[in-house]
Structures are given as C-alpha cells and as structure tokens.
Amino acid sequence: MEQKNFDPDGVGVDNGTYFGLPFAPETAELVLISAPWDVTVSYGAGAAYAPDAIIEASTQLDFYDPLAPGAWRRGIATADVDYSLLESSQRLRADAARVIDHLEGGGCLEDDYVVRKVRRVNEGCMSMNANVGAQASRWLDAGKTVGLVGGDHSTPYGLIRALGARHAAFGILHVDAHCDLRDAYEGFEFSHASIMFNVLRDVPQVTKIAQVAVRDFSESEAALAASSGRVATFDDLSLAAALFRGETWDAQCRRIVDALPQEVYVSFDIDALTFENCPHTGTPVSGGLTFNQAVWLLDTLTRSGRRIIGFDVVEVCPAPDERIDAITGARMLWKLCGQTLKSNGS
C-alpha cells in the first residue's frame, strides 16, 4: 500500500507490517526488526512465533495515543523478517529441550549425552546474535532508531551490542519478572535467563541497568545485582510495599527514572505484566505491573527529557486458541514506538 492511499481511520490492512503501516524502512524514523527465536526457553516455548502473531494482532489497533499523539506519522517501518532464524530455532530447540530434560532428571552438563547438544545450541545462538546485530547495524548506520520484536529474551543481545558500538554510555530500563543475571543458565551461554549478565560482561557502555518488577530470581543474581554497581533493583514486592505505604506510582516511576542516564534502551519482557495480560508467556510469575503502570513508567521516562535509543519487546507467547498475548504484545509495542519517537523530538 502506498503511503498516499493509507487511511489511518480505515480498516486495518494485513500487509505484513506491524500495525499495517505503509512506511518503508528507508524513509521511516523507526525500524522494527524481528527475531523469531526461542531456543533456550526454560519452561514454556512459543515466543518464536510472536512476530507473526503480533503483526496479525496489530492491525486491530487504533492509532490515537494521548501520550504520544501523532508520533507514528514520523514513520514506523517493518524490516523483512528473516525466517531462517525460525527454522534454526525449531531445529536447535530440540537439542535444548533434551539438555533441559536431562538436567531436570538429575543429569550433569559434563555427561556425554548433552555435551554436543550444548555446543550446537551455543554455536547457533552466536549465529543468531550475529544476525540480529547485522540487521540492527544496517538500520542504525542509516540513521534509524531500531526496535526489536522477539522471540525470547536472548534475542536483543545483538542490538544492544550494536548500540554499544555507537554510544559512549547508556542505561537500560529492564522491565521483567526476572533479573536475567544467570551465568550461562543450563549451560547455554546466551540463555534467555542470561541476557543482562551478558550485557554487563560484554557491553561496558551500559552504565546502569534499572530492573523493574523483578520477582523471581536466584540468590546469586541478587548478590550480583547488589555488588555490581551497575544494577539498580526495583523488585515487585518493594514497589508494592511502597504503594501500600502511600507512595504514588508516579513518585515511584520518577525514582526509577532518576537511576538512569540521559540515553536509555528499554528492554520489555511481557512477563513483567500481570497474568491477565500474558497468560501463555513462557515463565509466568504471580504479581507484576498492570498495563497502565508500565505505560506510565515509559511516559515518565520520556517526560524526564531522557532519550530512548532503542527497545525490545520479548517473551510474548501466542496461543492457537487465545489472542490476548499477541494483543498485549502489539499494544505494548505501539506504546514503545510512540514513546521512542516522542523522546527523539519532532
């Protein structure tokens, strides 16, 4: 569809792009790349199918956003989805699942049965990282802001590395039920549970990670967060306790944002939200933020004058008989697009 024929008040058109928008990546300000990949998920699989499901659900969305009115008109484009990632994910997921089953049955990573499988998974994840990094670099070098739609939470690594090569210092607003600070969880160096550990290790340009709504993490993760000097933890229970004591959500959001530098990457795991928003996400945890709390946090970030330099939405798991996960993912993606464009000026 040509841009001149696009009617934002008309019926959403399923043209293979997020939100059915007509923008080409070459002319848009914001380019969305996709990573259909969920090799290392440790509980429920399915996030690899999120990009297609979110594209389909996103055409049911109306465009007016009172917090970022008209921002979409500056251009939100969809880069071609590389479905070779999905094919590799499906193949390697079988190896990863056998490793996980072996460990859950009391086996060890040193056992001959799993050694080659772990190696294949790790090599495949490195290839995925390179693929995402190359996609991101192409559009960053063209002057675009890049957002990523996963996929599991391992998928943004290549984008974050690419941003690290182009920014001297930035922070990450990490909204998630989990800290993702595990070192090679289940033997997988680039596990979805290891993304922030890997960022701390490999991207020194990330000066601060503000982790929000985390509520399921290990003792070693808590110790790393407390000792690193680069992690600020706003766990779900502490946020709830502050509300119970009378601190408004607006005040808490300002406190969270104050922990971050001027340039910020947003990493949004859908399991940060309450169950009704993402009933099929791979590793659900009781508690969490409401949708509007999350949106208010994003708006607080942009109202502070900080600039969003990129983002991801991950761990959306569509179900064949229920659409709420994809709907929530599409609507959170829309809010992130609007806030990102707003934060980057007119």
Segments predicted by a language model, with ranges:
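Conserved alpha-helical scaffold segments that buttress catalytic/binding sites
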Residues: E2-S346
